[in-house]
């Protein structure tokens, strides 16, 4: 059976919930999603219980149907590996704090736009990139506290 996104390659630099859930849906629809984890692994692996084979079921669920690779994006070699992965990618999805990609020398305007003009760069954030809360972390507990839930 053909899937709607089977010819799309997505590089997934996301963590926690919003980003991994978004890329999980893309993978479920056939996209080739490559999850790039920190060189020490994804901290969400240990968020449980329940656990299965030493991994949190939460982590297993939001990362199903994905391939993964661990890369140290702070190192020159790690940046080279990411650039290589992006050469034939359609989409890059990340949910780092505002300015992180730029600090690493991987910003869209500074590097990615020119090097990969067809690449779609999706930046997920809780409060957007600008405005009074722009760039602030947007975890569920924070949103609940702010809204009085």
Per-region residue spans from a language model:
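N-terminal helix-loop segment corresponding to the beta1-alpha1 unit
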Residues: 1-149
């Amino acid at each position: 059976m053909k899937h709607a996104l089977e010819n799309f390659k997505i590089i997934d630099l996301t963590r926690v919930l919003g980003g991994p859930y978004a890329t999980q849906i893309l993978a479920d629809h056939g996209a080739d999603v490559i999850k790039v984890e920190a060189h020490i692994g994804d901290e969400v692996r240990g968020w449980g219980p329940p656990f299965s084979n030493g991994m949190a079921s939460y982590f297993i669920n939001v990362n199903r149907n994905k391939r993964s690779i661990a890369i140290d994006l702070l190192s020159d070699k790690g940046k080279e590996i990411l650039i290589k992965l992006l050469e034939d990618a359609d989409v890059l999805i990340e949910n780092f704090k505002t300015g992180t990609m730029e600090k690493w020398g991987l910003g869209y305007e500074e590097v990615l736009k020119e090097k990969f003009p067809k690449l779609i760069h999706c930046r997920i954030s809780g409060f957007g990139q600008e405005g009074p809360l722009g760039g602030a972390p947007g975890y569920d507990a924070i949103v609940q506290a702010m809204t009085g839930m």
